[in-house]
């Protein structure tokens, strides 16, 4: 019996366009100024160091080329890291260091009113209903936990952050690896078969299913991937209830 519902964000509860047309461009434009203003803040300085460590281990050809060229010029560390992070943004790479810093940048945007998140209408309704019915709700996204919380706190219809009990990002593991979902089930103190995972990515659904979770594939209009494979399909979150009985 399903007792826990674990959800992806982009393409599941939130339109892909909000992420690609609002969040990503905002972080890209605000990144340099943010790092300049906060480079001496201990928490941000640590994130800059984390990004540097990640860069040193990045075997991508473009990353290596940028690293070698940056070593030949005299420039503050935060500016070198900014150029690396911009490369990651341009290549849409799933970087934990980038996601952590983006979360800090977005926090400024949300708290100053420059960003308000948009969720699907059926997401508001479904999440509130499931919470009221006693289901334990969790989020698993490549975006940092801080960014996840902000997205649900500053929605156009108010703060719904408190509907969720669990938050997971790539610190627990890659979303396309089975062991990540095993770790999530352990963290939730729940048997894998009691967790329903909903995502718009078939590789993620495959990994979750391999770990023993029940999966639903979010096949929304406008989602970039439309390949459910053998996973049951939902068109919106209103279709989920039939699988909770």
From Swiss-Prot:
Pathway terms, separated by semicolons: Amino-acid biosynthesis; L-methionine biosynthesis via salvage pathway; L-methionine from S-methyl-5-thio-alpha-D-ribose 1-phosphate: step 3/6; Amino-acid biosynthesis; L-methionine biosynthesis via salvage pathway; L-methionine from S-methyl-5-thio-alpha-D-ribose 1-phosphate: step 4/6
Pfam family, one: Hydrolase
Quaternary structure, from the entry: Monomer.
Keywords: Amino-acid biosynthesis, Hydrolase, Magnesium, Metal-binding, Methionine biosynthesis
Disulfide bonds: none
Catalytic function, reaction form: 5-methylsulfanyl-2,3-dioxopentyl phosphate + H2O = 1,2-dihydroxy-5-(methylsulfanyl)pent-1-en-3-one + phosphate
Gene3D superfamilies: 1.10.720.60, HAD superfamily/HAD-like
Functional summary from the UniProt entry: Bifunctional enzyme that catalyzes the enolization of 2,3-diketo-5-methylthiopentyl-1-phosphate (DK-MTP-1-P) into the intermediate 2-hydroxy-3-keto-5-methylthiopentenyl-1-phosphate (HK-MTPenyl-1-P), which is then dephosphorylated to form the acireductone 1,2-dihydroxy-3-keto-5-methylthiopentene (DHK-MTPene).
Full protein name: Enolase-phosphatase E1
Cofactor(s) needed: Mg(2+)
PANTHER family from the UniProt entry: ENOLASE-PHOSPHATASE E1 (PTHR20371:SF1)
Cofactor note text: Binds 1 Mg(2+) ion per subunit.
Family as reported in the entry's similarity comment: Belongs to the HAD-like hydrolase superfamily. MasA/MtnC family.
GO term, biological process aspect, one: L-methionine salvage from methylthioadenosine
InterPro entries found in the cross-reference section: Enolase-ppase_E1, HAD-like_sf, HAD-SF_hydro_IA, HAD_sf
Gene Ontology molecular function: 2,3-diketo-5-methylthiopentyl-1-phosphate enolase activity; 2-hydroxy-3-keto-5-methylthiopentenyl-1-phosphate phosphatase activity; acireductone synthase activity; magnesium ion binding
EC annotation from Swiss-Prot or TrEMBL: 3.1.3.77
């Amino acid at each position: 019996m399903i007792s826990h519902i674990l959800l992806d964000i982009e393409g599941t509860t939130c339109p892909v366009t909000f992420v690609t047309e609002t969040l990503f461009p905002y972080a890209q434009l605000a990144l340099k100024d943010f790092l300049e203003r906060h480079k001496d803040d201990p928490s941000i300085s640590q994130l800059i160091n984390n990004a540097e460590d990640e860069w040193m281990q990045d075997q991508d050809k473009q990353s290596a080329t940028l690293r070698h060229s940056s070593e030949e010029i005299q420039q503050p560390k935060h500016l070198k890291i900014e150029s690396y992070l911009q490369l990651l943004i341009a290549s849409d790479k799933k970087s934990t260091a980038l996601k952590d810093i983006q979360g800090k940048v977005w926090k400024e945007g949300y708290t100053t009113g420059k960003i308000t998140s948009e969720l699907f209408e059926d997401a508001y309704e479904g999440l509130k209903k499931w919470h009221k019915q006693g289901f334990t709700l969790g989020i698993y996204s490549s975006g940092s936990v801080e960014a996840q919380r902000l997205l649900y706190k500053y929605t156009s219809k108010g703060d719904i952050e408190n509907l969720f009990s669990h938050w997971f990002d790539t610190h627990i593991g890659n979303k396309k690896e089975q062991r990540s979902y095993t770790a999530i089930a352990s963290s939730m103190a729940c048997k894998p078969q009691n967790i329903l995972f909903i995502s718009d990515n078939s590789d993620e659904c495959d990994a979750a299913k391999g770990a023993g979770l029940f999966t639903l594939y979010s096949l929304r209009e406008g989602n970039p991937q439309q390949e459910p494979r053998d996973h049951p399909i939902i068109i919106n979150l209103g279709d989920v209830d039939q699988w909770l009985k």
